[in-house]
């Protein structure tokens, strides 16, 4: 069974659904560890910095995005580790997962249609193609 699970989140509804699956899988074994990774996208974080009043306000806004996700773990009494990184989410998640030898990566999917995915690409698709372990994509 999976002992070392990486849950990639962005604070969206899709991340909340993937959180439920991470908790369910984590409960299947007593040795399971779930680590949440939240990657601050450079292009979005520049905008956040410009529109926030202070560093404290910016940090508060980022933590607010993760509040529901962390709340799910706390409600279930399931311990977790939270890691925040800066960069392009796809490659950052892949590097972190591969460098830290996770058994499973769980990521939510926005449900892009085939044209959107071809033009834009998706983080879940990038992760699934490049990470060295199994990937669970939650719709």
Task: Report residues per predicted region.
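A short acidic, glycine-rich active-site loop
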Residues: 53-64
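Phosphate- and divalent-cation-binding pockets in alpha/beta enzyme and binding domains
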Residues: 17, 92, 114
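Short loop/turn motifs at secondary-structure junctions
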Residues: 1, 30-33, 78-79, 101
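Class I S-adenosyl-L-methionine
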Residues: 23, 63, 67-74
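Small/aliphatic-rich secondary-structure junction motif
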Residues: 3-49
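General small-molecule cofactor/ligand-binding pocket signal
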Residues: 35-37, 81-85, 136
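Structural beta-alpha unit
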Residues: 74-105
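Gly/Ser-rich helix-loop-strand patches that form or flank binding pockets
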Residues: 4, 96-139
């Amino acid at each position: 069974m999976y002992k070392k699970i990486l849950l990639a989140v962005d604070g969206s509804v899709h991340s909340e659904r993937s959180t439920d699956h991470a908790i369910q899988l984590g409960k299947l074994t007593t040795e399971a560890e779930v680590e949440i990774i939240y990657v601050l996208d450079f292009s979005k974080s520049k905008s956040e910095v410009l529109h926030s009043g202070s560093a404290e306000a910016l940090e508060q806004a980022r933590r607010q995005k993760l509040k529901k996700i962390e709340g799910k773990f706390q409600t279930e009494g399931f311990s977790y580790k939270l890691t925040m990184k800066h960069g392009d989410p796809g490659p950052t998640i892949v590097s972190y997962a591969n460098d830290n030898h996770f058994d499973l990566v769980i990521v939510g999917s926005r449900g892009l249609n085939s044209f959107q995915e071809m033009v834009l690409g998706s983080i879940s698709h990038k992760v699934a193609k490049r990470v060295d372990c199994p990937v669970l994509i939650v719709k």
